[in-house]
């Protein structure tokens, strides 16, 4: 069997993965490990060579994304003698695997000759007791992935360390109600995907998506050959939660590649409706002040219509900074009034103590706190409350009256309040790890772009 891992500048993650692989129950002498490095510059290759002398490494000369990386590995595998490998196990570089993860996937394929692909149940690395997905189905009307058991939790696992979970009993069919040991699905993520080598070669390489939806398309294409796709409730991996990842340049690939997927496997109406939904997202990002991310949606549509695939050179003007450096904003003498909404969990984002310190150091700094009608409790003392009415219309009028009264409005990347983006000179978008300072949206800019928006709306899918 061949294990294919693709990595790019995630040295510590891929080392953790390889360490977890050293503890799996599947016989090590039956495994070859191939790591595809996408031109990392963080010392990944050097660390791999120093710690693991029984793996093979192929270095790409540039970052080819997950698509190009796996295609490099698959091309190498397809060139081997047909009898050399019966199975190929594709793994993300930022997962750790349960000791029985591979054995249980092999058991599924060995017992079911008509199943060509078996995938693991994906748990969340940051919340190890929570399921991220147990396979998924693909809605070919819009490209949405319908995840099984999404965010379902195993309460008895709370408080357990990940190292203990990797060797504990991991049969979810025994701890979750109405959960089968395995089930047929339409898609399993290449975070942990076992496929029969002959079927992989028959299916071919991944479409040139660079990242995202490439494994979805590959699963759909494999199923077209008459083979089943299954997920195992006994094979577990832990992966960094997508919920913890803030939307950025990846939005381009998500929105472009889903159009290629629908164009190939659905109909023109689905493509048309998805283009229009993408245009709605473009308008939303314009309205909240993330204009650079808004443009990615239009670029995604344009490149799809022009047949452009692969990697795109994306340069975003606004950069994310570590949350610990937010103090430089709060201590800027030019910043005198800041408004904070209830949607920001100041303890979770670790900025509470930074605000407390800034308010002590700068008595002239006024911090306003927007209090929702359903929860009047404030997270910080010494803030000036702004009580919001219950009526939605009244709340919008309140925001309208507050416009131009603040230097900075804080916004949560996870739960953005649209009218809040319009009441300050700048918006500081924050999440658990980073923040990004952006200018407030401009109505004149949005109005100038409306004709182009309307034109694209009516040309969608033609």
Spans of model-derived segments:
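A conserved acidic beta->alpha catalytic loop
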Residues: 20, 37-46, 62
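Glycine-rich, basic loop-to-helix element that forms the pyrophosphate-binding segment
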Residues: 59-82, 88, 104
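Short, well-formed alpha-helical segments that are part of the catalytic scaffolds
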Residues: 10-24, 350-355
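A short, conserved alpha-helix in the catalytic core of glycosyltransferases
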Residues: 178-180, 185-204, 208-236
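Active-site-adjacent helix/loop segment of glycosyltransferases
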Residues: 183, 220, 224-305
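Short beta-strand-to-loop acidic/aromatic patch adjacent to the donor-nucleotide binding site
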Residues: 84-96
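Acidic/His-rich active-site region of diverse nucleotide-sugar glycosyltransferases
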Residues: 69, 95-203
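Non-catalytic, C-terminal membrane-associated alpha-helical segments of glycosyltransferases
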Residues: 270-347, 430-462
